[in-house]
C-alpha cells in the first residue's frame, strides 16, 4: 500500500527539520546494503550527531524546494539514495561514513553539500582527514601550556642567572 498524502507531508516536514539543523549532507548509493548494515551505519553516525535517512528522491526534492542552502542537492537525487545529515562534528560524521564504506565495500558516496556548495570526492575525503574538535582543542591547549611553561622558565631564569653571577663574583673576589 502506498503512502498517504498526509504521511508524505509528515516525511517532508521531518526532512526539512533535519536539513535546518544539518551543516553537511552526504548522498550515498545504498543499493545492495542489508537492513542490518544500514542499522550499523546509523549506529556509527549517532556518535557524531548525524542521521541517515532513506527516502524517495521526490520527497527530498520537496524538502529542499525553495531552500537556497540545499538547492544544489537536486543534482544528486537519482537512483537509490540514503542521505547522511551531519549536525555537529562534520569531520567525525564523514569519517564514520568512510570507515563504514571501507569495511563493507558495498556503498559509495555520490557527493555531498556543505554550506550550499557541492563537494567532490576529494573534498569529502579532505573533510574526513581534518582533526576532530577534541583533537584541535587538545592541540591548542598544548600550545598554550607550552607558551606558559616557557614564560615561567624565562621568569625563573632571571633571578637564577643573577644569583649565579653574584656567586661567581663573590668567589672571584675572595681569590
UniProtKB/Swiss-Prot annotation:
Cited SUPFAM superfamilies: Ribosomal protein L10-like
Cited Pfam families: Ribosomal_L10
Keyword Secreted: no
GO terms classed as biological process: translation
GO cellular component labels: ribonucleoprotein complex; ribosome
Assembly: Part of the ribosomal stalk of the 50S ribosomal subunit. The N-terminus interacts with L11 and the large rRNA to form the base of the stalk. The C-terminus forms an elongated spine to which L12 dimers bind in a sequential fashion forming a multimeric L10(L12)X complex.
Name of the molecule in the record: Large ribosomal subunit protein uL10
Source organism per UniProt: Synechococcus sp. (strain CC9605)
Amino acid at each position: 500500500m502506498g503512502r498517504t498524502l498526509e504521511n508524505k507531508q509528515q516525511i517532508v516536514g521531518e526532512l526539512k527539520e533535519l536539513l535546518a539543523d544539518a551543516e553537511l549532507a552526504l548522498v550515498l548509493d545504498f543499493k545492495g546494503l542489508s537492513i542490518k548494515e544500514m542499522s550499523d551505519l546509523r549506529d556509527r553516525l549517532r556518535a557524531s550527531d548525524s542521521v541517515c535517512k532513506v527516502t524517495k528522491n521526490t520527497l527530498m526534492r520537496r524538502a529542499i524546494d525553495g531552500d537556497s542552502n540545499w538547492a544544489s542537492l537536486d543534482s544528486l537525487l537519482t537512483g537509490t539514495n540514503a542521505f547522511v545529515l551531519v549536525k555537529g562534528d562534520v569531520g567525525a560524521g564523514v569519517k564514520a561514513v568512510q570507515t563504514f564504506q571501507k569495511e563493507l565495500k558495498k556503498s559509495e558516496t555520490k557527493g555531498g553539500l556543505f554550506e550550499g556548495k557541492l563537494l567532490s570526492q576529494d573534498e569529502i575525503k579532505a573533510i574526513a582527514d581534518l582533526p576532530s574538535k577534541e583533537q584541535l582543542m587538545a592541540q591548542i591547549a598544548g600550545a598554550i601550556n607550552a607558551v606558559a611553561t616557557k614564560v615561567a622558565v624565562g621568569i625563573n631564569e632571571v633571578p637564577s642567572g643573577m644569583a649565579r653571577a653574584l656567586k661567581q663574583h663573590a668567589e672571584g673576589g675572595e681569590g
